[in-house]
């Protein structure tokens, strides 16, 4: 189920000991915003966590990586109706038992105004996110940094 209505803020956090393993989103053309849905799976993560400040300004590129051995466990965001864009903060927690190595950046997971789906393979976790805003489409395209 989507956790926000278009134009509304959201604050998603996986339960303790879990990481984000699925990111899904649809675009509402009328309200010029996305609805978001996240999935989590159990990984060996600790409660040593940190939350970023805002990783982007409205209309500007976003490029964020969780620090150290941390991986993505939560995302918070709010929308501006004048600029028709969102700002994002990220929550990251330490992974026990493995270093975040073998990282790569995914293919773009959506087109402007199109549906988005990222499903993270077993044994991988989301380390970060990269996104660009386009004024003509009033939307962002996304890639994610994935690590083993």
From Swiss-Prot:
Cysteines engaged in disulfide bonds, as pairs: 14-40, 66-93, 103-147
Secreted as UniProt keyword: yes
Gene Ontology biological-process annotations: cell adhesion; collagen fibril organization
Entry PTM: The terminal mannose residues of the polysaccharide are 3-O-methylated. No tyrosine sulfation was detected.
Keyword annotations: Cell adhesion, Disulfide bond, Extracellular matrix, Glycoprotein, Secreted
Highest taxon of source: Eukaryota
Subcellular location per the Swiss-Prot or TrEMBL entry: Secreted, Extracellular space, Extracellular matrix
Keyword ATP-binding set for record: no
GO cellular component: extracellular matrix; extracellular space
Residues bearing attached sugar chains per UniProt: 44
Stored InterPro entries: Dermatopontin (IPR026645)
Principal location class: secreted
Family: Belongs to the dermatopontin family.
Function per UniProt: Seems to mediate adhesion by cell surface integrin binding.
Protein name: Dermatopontin
